[in-house]
């Protein structure tokens, strides 16, 4: 008897310990971010999670996707001012340059839509009543209307009835033709009513996790245009004083900026960097060209180089003054870099350029850049074009003055997927081309 009593207490204690441990584990895991979206800091509602998965897919597959380069999301806004519950969508951010490829409506089964027959048969035990029960599918009608000036409810535009599975967590409806018509007719404010058979939904969902949303997959024809990323992501002029909003075009700057010398402007037109007057070095002093590496330098030039390291022989800078130790480190760092045209590392943080407030992901990316000389003879590794080869020969011969060396420029580039909020706080996913340098060449 005592043994059985002890075993009973022991089993009860084990049960309580396991129960407490299970609750502790559940409480801990509930605080963890969803898998795969912790790095982009999204909310846990279905729309945010859906866009997070699309971002991961587009980042993984890049330009190989057949779904275009743009995904726009539109969350429904509940509205009951027109008598019956409905949802409004503001599609005004959809651009004319974005060719709609596909559009889907996502909505949850509305609660309280069960008919009186369903409730009666659930309480009844008659087999005849159960035979009259509907199947696991449900007829749902979607009525779309235009909204004039975002206030007056317009005429009915689209009416579609479909059969959905009752046990589905979320329903998905293809509304590509509806969105295409709305874009073509510029009816970018639309409303939607959901009805079950002849009865409209009586439960009005205002919970963000239950609100319907629309995803539009489009191909933006203007995304490859010059300065396209600034047109979509730059919200203010970075050169504007005090960071205020600017009404100028993204590629213009205030008139109050410091004007450069005309000689600098002339040098920028011929692909040459402006001369640094306070620290002039000849090409032979900074670098040994590849075809002169085995040639012994004369003592005169060596003496000249040693003299350059003397602080007294360095001309004074009109802007900045550095001690000799700092200058030696800078020159040593410059000499350590590869002489030939090549890809150099550059990491861009969107916070540094003031875009982090609306860019969700990525927070930063490896952009790289191209730098280096394209002198004759050019190595095969820089993949020079025929024109660049001829230009380098003409430059080396020197028979035509003013001809610059070929430029070190990106040859192959990769795209970058960016998930951000537009000015209407809608989540947008775009795949911008030519965002990261993969290789460089002389052109």
From Swiss-Prot:
Q: Where in the cell is it found?
A: Secreted
According to the UniProt entry, which residue ranges have a biased composition of type Polar residues? 242-254
Q: Which GO terms describe its biological process?
A: anatomical structure morphogenesis; osteoblast differentiation; positive regulation of osteoblast differentiation
Region labeled Induces head formation — which residues? 99-202
List the propeptide residues: 23-333
Q: Which UniProt keywords apply?
A: Cleavage on pair of basic residues, Cytokine, Developmental protein, Differentiation, Disulfide bond, Glycoprotein, Growth factor, Morphogen, Secreted, Signal
The protein's matches in CDD domains, at most eight in alphabetical order, are given as: TGF_beta_GDF10
Any coiled-coil ranges, and where?
none
What are the GO MF terms of this UniProt record?
cytokine activity; growth factor activity; morphogen activity; nodal binding
Query: According to its record, what are the GO cellular component terms?
Result: extracellular space
Which range is the signal sequence, renumbered to this chain? 1-22
| Top-level lineage group | Eukaryota
What Pfam families does the entry give? TGF_beta
According to its UniProt entry, what is the function of this protein? Answer: Dorsalizing factor. Antagonizes mesoderm formation by nodal-like proteins and ventralizing BMPs. Cooperates with cer1 to promote embryonic head formation.
Q: Which family does the record assign?
A: Belongs to the TGF-beta family.
Q: Which PANTHER family match?
A: GROWTH_DIFFERENTIATION FACTOR 10 (PTHR11848:SF145), TGF-BETA FAMILY (PTHR11848)
Subunit-level organization:
Homodimer. Can form heterodimers with admp, bmp2-I and/or bmp2-II, derriere and nodal/nr-1.
Protein name (Swiss-Prot/TrEMBL): Growth/differentiation factor 10
Organism of origin: Xenopus laevis
């Amino acid at each position: 008897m005592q043994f059985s009593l002890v075993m009973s207490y022991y089993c009860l204690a084990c049960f309580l310990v396991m129960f407490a441990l299970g609750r502790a584990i559940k409480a801990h895991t509930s605080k963890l971010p969803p898998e795969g979206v912790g790095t982009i800091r999204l909310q846990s509602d279905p729309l945010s999670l859906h866009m997070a998965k699309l971002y991961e897919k587009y980042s993984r597959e890049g330009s190989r996707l057949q779904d275009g380069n743009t995904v726009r999301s539109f969350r429904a806004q509940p509205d009951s001012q027109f008598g019956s519950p409905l949802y409004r969508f503001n599609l005004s951010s959809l651009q004319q340059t974005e060719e709609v490829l596909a559009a889907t409506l996502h909505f949850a089964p509305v609660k309280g839509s069960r008919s009186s027959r369903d409730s009666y048969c659930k309480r009844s035990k008659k087999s005849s009543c159960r035979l009259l029960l509907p199947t696991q599918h449900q007829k749902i009608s979607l009525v779309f209307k235009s909204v004039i000036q975002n206030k007056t409810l317009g005429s009915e535009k689209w009416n579609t009835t479909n059969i959905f599975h009752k046990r589905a967590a979320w329903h998905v409806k293809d509304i590509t033709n509806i969105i295409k018509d709305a874009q073509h007719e510029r009816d970018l404010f639309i409303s939607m009513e959901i009805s079950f058979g002849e009865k409209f939904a009586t439960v009005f969902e205002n919970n963000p996790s239950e609100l319907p949303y629309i995803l539009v997959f489009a191909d933006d024809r203007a995304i490859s245009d010059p300065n396209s990323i600034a047109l979509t992501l730059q919200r203010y002029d970075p050169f504007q004083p005090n960071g205020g909003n600017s009404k100028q075009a993204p590629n213009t700057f205030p008139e109050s900026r410091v004007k450069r010398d005309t000689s600098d402007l002339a040098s920028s037109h011929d692909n040459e960097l402006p001369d640094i007057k306070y620290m002039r070095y000849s090409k032979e002093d900074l670098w040994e060209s590849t075809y002169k590496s085995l040639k012994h330098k004369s003592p005169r030039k060596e003496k000249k180089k040693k003299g350059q390291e003397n602080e007294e022989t360095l001309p004074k800078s009109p802007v900045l003054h550095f001690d000799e130790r700092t200058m030696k480190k800078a020159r040593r760092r410059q000499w350590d870099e590869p002489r030939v045209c090549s890809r150099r590392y550059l990491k861009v943080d969107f916070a540094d350029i003031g875009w982090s407030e609306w860019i969700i992901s990525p927070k930063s990316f490896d952009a790289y850049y191209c730098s280096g000389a394209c002198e004759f003879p050019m190595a095969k590794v820089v993949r020079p074009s025929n024109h660049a080869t001829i230009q380098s020969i003409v430059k080396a011969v020197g028979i035509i003055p003013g001809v610059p060396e070929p430029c070190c420029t990106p040859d192959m580039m990769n795209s970058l997927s960016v998930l951000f909020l537009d000015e209407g706080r809608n989540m947008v996913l775009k795949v911008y081309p030519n965002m990261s340098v993969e290789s460089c060449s002389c052109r």
